[in-house]
């Protein structure tokens, strides 16, 4: 089992002068660092790749930075879908430069775009077509494409495990994988164990945070059911904590507010990781190694 954390637990934007954070993450006992990329994120991939390799840290990337709205694989307009494919391909190129093992997120659409309408008959089909092309492009570069269902407050396209598997089946490519996010799906799935079983053939990663996006443990997430089912299906992929540091920004807390997090659940990134790791390891130790 690998344990990871999103870089947003420590900083609002990855850059060359943030390399020391990889040392911090390694020192906390993490095996994986998830970086956010986008049009406003600028760094030297070779420097990040080298430091991660020196530390033995696995890298993954996701599109958490600036992502133009007209770049959307699910858009009604074919030109926007083509622009979306080209944009994601550039992020895959960056992932390959980093030797990152995955490009992950709600890549099927554009997070934050929620179309309150009856879905057009062809929406899943044309989205699947774009995902197939992206998965093929990434496979040549040894980068997994990992798709994440999100809350209906963030997307109208894929809110449940069943919907994600339907889309993956339509896209029909072996380089498409699934990510289960305990925070996003607390409003979408009544039975986490059933959702894990649904995703099992493609499940690669689990984002592990509480229902308030705080450190895992003590909230509403049904952790016992989640970990029982993960053990049942033989999951051995990354468990990754994801949150927004609530002490950083132009003024302390500005970053979290800018990401829509209005309560102080991650004032100290290192403490967040320590608390979360202790909980996650205890859940794994009581099942996988019993």
PLM features per residue range, with description:
Residues 10-12, 37-38, 81, 123, ...:
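Short, flexible loop segments at the rims of nucleotide/cofactor-binding pockets, characterized by
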Residues 10, 68-70, 110-113, 151-153, ...:
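A short, flexible beta-alpha/helix-coil linker loop
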Residues 1-4, 9-11, 16-26, 99-101, ...:
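Histidine-acidic metal/acid-base catalytic patches
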Residues 46-56, 130-138, 195-198, 225-230:
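Catalytic-core regions built around general acid/base machinery
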Residues 31, 35-128, 240-250, 286:
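Structural motif corresponding to the early beta-alpha repeats
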Residues 39, 147, 180:
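Short loop/edge segments at beta-strand edges and connector loops
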Residues 77-177, 263, 267-271:
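Active-site acidic/histidine proton-transfer and metal-coordination neighborhood
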Residues 54-59, 98, 140-141, 174, ...:
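Helix C-cap/helix->beta junction micro-motif
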């Amino acid at each position: 089992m690998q344990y990871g954390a999103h870089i947003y637990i420590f900083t609002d934007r990855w850059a060359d002068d943030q390399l020391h954070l990889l040392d911090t993450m390694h020192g906390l006992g993490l095996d994986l660092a998830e970086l956010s990329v986008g049009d406003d994120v600028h760094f030297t991939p070779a420097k990040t790749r080298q430091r991660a390799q020196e530390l033995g840290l696995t890298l993954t990337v996701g599109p958490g930075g600036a992502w133009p709205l007209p770049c959307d694989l699910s858009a009604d307009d074919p030109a926007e879908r083509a622009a979306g494919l080209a944009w994601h391909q550039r992020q895959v190129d960056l992932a390959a430069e980093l030797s990152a093992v995955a490009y992950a997120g709600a890549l099927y659409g554009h997070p934050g775009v929620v179309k309150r309408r009856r879905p057009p008959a062809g929406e899943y089909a044309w989205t699947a077509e774009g995902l197939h092309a992206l998965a093929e492009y990434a496979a040549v570069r040894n980068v997994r494409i990992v798709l994440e269902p999100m809350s209906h407050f963030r997307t109208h396209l894929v809110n449940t495990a069943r919907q994600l598997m339907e889309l993956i089946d339509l896209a029909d490519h072996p380089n498409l994988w699934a990510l289960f996010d305990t925070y996003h799906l607390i409003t979408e799935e009544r039975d986490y164990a059933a959702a894990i079983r649904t995703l099992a053939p493609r499940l690669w990663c689990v984002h592990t945070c509480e229902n308030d996006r705080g450190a895992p443990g003590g909230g509403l997430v049904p952790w016992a059911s989640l970990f029982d089912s993960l053990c049942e299906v033989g999951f051995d992929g990354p468990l990754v904590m994801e949150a927004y540091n609530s002490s950083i920004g132009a003024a302390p807390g500005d970053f979290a507010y800018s990401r829509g997090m209005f309560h102080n659940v991650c004032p100290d990134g290192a403490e967040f990781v320590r608390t979360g790791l202790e909980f996650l390891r205890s859940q794994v130790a009581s099942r996988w190694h019993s």
